[in-house]
């Protein structure tokens, strides 16, 4: 619901363009604040020194989350859109979150538009002091290097996990290769 409150303030320019500028300075809608506070009640009550959350939908409201939590550590994990849109995500249809965009019955195109919208929103958001970008492909193929970077950023050691190199560039084996002109600048050569 917080995503829908936020999206009311996004100015769709038509096509694949949105103006996010007002979101950085306007007062945050009190309904949004209430919904986020409700949603994060358990996280905020937690007494641990380290706490947080990982939700893809957070990207849909990033400008206001950054303003509400300016001292948080933000890790932006971004993946080659061709791989990202092969699988389903809760954010596949932006209309579910009140975001206007060119409607299409093509599922991959809808996912591609969602990927672009979220990427554009992140790029338009003034970065907080504690911001780090991690490429999914780098994390998978160079895990130790990326974990070292993350540990330096966060200030504490992280556990190692098993990663699957076959999760990188899986679009190459897809029945239908997602190739949208508006995503090409974001393709990764792993």
Where are these regions (language model features)?
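N-terminal cationic-hydrophobic initiation segments that often serve targeting/anchoring roles
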Residues: 44, 65-66, 123-126
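PAPS/PAP-binding and catalytic site of the sulfotransferase fold
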Residues: 1, 65-69, 133-158
């Amino acid at each position: 619901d917080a995503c829908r409150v936020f999206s009311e303030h996004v100015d769709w320019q038509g096509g694949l363009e949105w103006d996010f500028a007002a979101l950085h300075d306007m007062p945050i809608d009190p309904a949004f604040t209430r919904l986020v506070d409700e949603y994060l009640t358990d996280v905020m009550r937690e007494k641990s020194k380290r706490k947080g959350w990982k939700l893809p939908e957070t990207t849909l409201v990033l400008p206001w989350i950054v303003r509400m939590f300016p001292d948080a550590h933000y890790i932006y994990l971004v993946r080659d859109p061709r791989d990202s849109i092969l699988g389903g995500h809760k954010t596949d249809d932006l209309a579910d979150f009140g975001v206007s965009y060119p409607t299409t019955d093509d599922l991959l195109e809808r996912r591609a538009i969602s990927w672009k919208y979220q990427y554009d929103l992140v790029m338009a958001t003034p970065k907080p002091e504690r911001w780090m970008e991690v490429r999914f492909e780098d994390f998978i193929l160079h895990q130790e290097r990326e974990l070292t970077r993350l540990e330096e950023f966060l200030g504490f050691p992280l556990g190692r996990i098993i990663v699957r190199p076959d999760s990188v560039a899986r679009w190459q084996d897809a029945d239908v290769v997602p190739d949208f002109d508006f995503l090409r600048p974001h393709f990764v050569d792993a």
